[in-house]
Structures are given as structure tokens and as C-alpha cells.
Design a protein with these regions (language model features):
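Outer-membrane beta-barrel translocator/channel fold
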Residues: 26-41, 166-207
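Transmembrane beta-strands of outer-membrane beta-barrel pores
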Residues: 20-26, 83-85, 92-96, 138-144, ...
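Residues that define the transmembrane beta-barrel architecture of outer-membrane proteins
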Residues: 1-2, 44, 71-75, 82, ...
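Repeated loop/turn-to-beta-strand initiation elements of outer-membrane beta-barrel proteins
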Residues: 14-16, 85-90, 130-135, 161-167
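Residue-level signature of outer-membrane beta-barrel architecture
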Residues: 8, 80-83, 125-128, 157-159
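Outer-membrane beta-barrel translocator domains and adjoining extracellular loop/strand segments
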Residues: 30-33, 100-107, 145-152, 177-184
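Extracellular loop and loop/strand-boundary signature of outer-membrane beta-barrel proteins
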Residues: 63-64, 102-110, 139-141, 200-202
Length: 207
């Protein structure tokens, strides 16, 4: 199938990326990693050009935008840029073979969900001056019977040439499909009773 990629420098400070049916077959393969006796899911470095371009616009103190979970997009669009003291990043994409990370206090797992998913991320930063930066981030992923939304604000204060104070506060809501809820949020075993809450409508399954 034909693949179309667009990289347009609208201005020296603003960049638009778009892709339809992207071909990632030429992207370097991941390095082998051992997951024996590893209770946490493996993280792989992003190597696909669409997601790599201006990736730092979405950075924060936590790894909130992990694009490797987007396996097989049919399309994607991304806008990044700066205007005076403002920095802005937005991307939207779909995924034909979605997987999600199931977090836990002592472990994490990767689970696959049926159907197509949509993913989006928005990041904004404002530099008050050379010493103070304020930011906001929002991510959204939806599929049939699944949704996850994360919102957060952050700030960075340079106190001196050697000291920096940073903080970030986050709020998230998640709804899991019934099959995943039953698989990862069960209280059948006595030692698992403290692991999961059992909220109404499978919302915010909390590990």
C-alpha cells in the first residue's frame, strides 16, 4: 500500500508532521532485552521518525507520552512550535493493534485490546523568565470499552546556579474492558485483596 509522509516547516519555529499508512519497515529493530524474572514491562526506545521529530516538546518529569504503545497507526498528525515564551505540542493518531500498560505497585504488564484506538497528547509550556517555567500536559487514549485520560501541571524554578526546584501534579481516570478488569482486578485470592479496588463500571481500576 502507498505511504504518504509530510514534514512542513510552516515557519522557522513551527513544524507540521503528517503521515498516512506509514511504513516503518526500514526502522532499526529493537535491541534484545531479557525479561526473565522481570516483573515490570519492558520499555523500548522510540525510533520511528514521525514520533521522534520534536519529541522533546512532550517531555515532562514523568514519562507520560510513551508512543511505543502505538503499534500500527493508519494516520497521524503532529504540530509543534514556539512563539515568544510559549511552547506547544499536539499530536493525534490511531492504532489498529493497540496495547496498553497495566500498572501496579510491584509489577506491570502489557495487555492487548480489540479493535481500533485513538490517541492524542497536548503539551504547553510557558517560560516566565530564564528561571521560571510553567507547564500543562494532557493525554487521551480511547477504544471500545476502554479510555484513559491524564492531566497534569508542572513548574520549574531555578533557585541558583546549582539548585533547581521542580514539581508536577497529575490526575488520571481509566476505564478498562470487562475481560481485562476480570483478569487484572480480581479479589479471588486472599493475597490479592489489597491489590485492586472494585469500582463501579470498571472505572479507575486501582493497583
Amino acid at each position: 500500500e502507498a505511504s504518504i509522509d509530510l514534514r512542513w516547516g510552516i515557519t522557522p519555529d513551527w513544524l507540521l508532521n503528517a503521515t498516512i499508512n506509514p511504513d516503518f519497515s526500514t526502522v532499526e529493530a529493537d535491541n534484545a532485552q531479557l525479561n526473565i524474572n522481570n516483573t515490570f514491562a519492558l520499555f523500548n526506545r522510540e525510533k520511528r521518525p514521525f514520533f521522534l521529530d520534536n519529541q522533546d516538546y512532550f517531555d515532562s518529569d514523568y514519562n507520560l507520552v510513551y508512543t511505543r504503545n502505538i503499534n500500527a497507526p493508519n494516520y497521524g498528525a503532529k504540530l509543534t512550535g514556539r512563539e515568544n515564551n510559549h511552547a506547544f505540542g499536539l499530536f493525534i493518531t490511531d492504532d489498529q493493534n493497540p496495547n496498553i500498560l497495566i500498572p501496579g505497585n510491584r509489577s506491570s504488564s502489557v495487555a492487548f485490546i480489540d479493535g481500533e484506538s485513538k490517541a492524542a497528547a497536548l503539551r504547553y509550556r510557558y517560560s516566565v523568565n530564564n528561571d521560571i517555567t510553567l507547564g500543562w500536559i494532557s493525554t487521551l487514549r480511547t477504544a471500545e470499552n476502554y479510555s484513559n485520560n491524564v492531566n497534569g501541571i508542572d513548574a520549574r524554578f531555578r533557585l541558583s546556579t546549582a539548585d533547581v526546584f521542580k514539581f508536577q501534579t497529575l490526575f488520571s481516570t481509566t476505564k478498562y474492558p470487562n475481560d481485562l478488569f476480570k483478569q487484572f482486578c480480581n479479589v479471588d485470592e486472599e493475597n490479592e485483596q489489597a491489590r485492586c479496588a472494585t469500582p463501579e463500571n470498571n472505572d479507575d481500576c486501582q493497583f
